[in-house]
Amino acid sequence: MYLPWGVVLAGGANGFGAGAYQTGTICEVSTQIAVRLPDEIVAFIDDEVRGQHARSRAAVVLRALERERRRRLAERDAEILATNTSATGDLDTLAGHCARTALDID
């Protein structure tokens, strides 16, 4: 989600630059990190921003990480389906597994 830059509340509890970006009633807490990237990746990120495909470098990195997270979750779901369904396609075993599995919801 893209939020317009708002008020930055400096200093986080962990002392590593965590702050809250606030616009109206929407408040999103984030932590700033530094990473080293190859020049060609940085050039791609800058092209994305310059071409208005993203609002900032951080938005490009966030989009890529969210996509990777969704891919891994889908991969996990596929493994669960593969191990918990019978050859006949009966989903009773899978339904039982789902009923016993705690949801990872924030």
UniProtKB/Swiss-Prot annotation:
Membrane-spanning ranges: none
Keyword field contains Flavoprotein: no
Disulfide bond sites: none
The keyword Membrane is annotated on this UniProt entry: no
Keyword terms: Toxin-antitoxin system
GO biological process, one term: negative regulation of growth
Induction remarks: Mildly induced (about 4-fold) when grown in a non-replicating state.
Single GO term (MF): toxin sequestering activity
Quaternary organization: Forms a complex with cognate toxin MazF3, possibly with 1:1 stoichiometry.
Database matches in NCBIfam families: YlcI_YnfO_N
Purpose: Antitoxin component of a type II toxin-antitoxin (TA) system. Upon expression in E.coli and M.smegmatis neutralizes the effect of cognate toxin MazF3. Overexpression of MazE3 alone decreased persister cells formation in M.smegmatis upon challenge with gentamicin or kanamycin.
Name under which the protein is recorded: Antitoxin MazE3
Organism from which the protein derives: Mycobacterium tuberculosis (strain ATCC 25618 / H37Rv)
Lineage of origin: Bacteria, Bacillati, Actinomycetota, Actinomycetes, Mycobacteriales
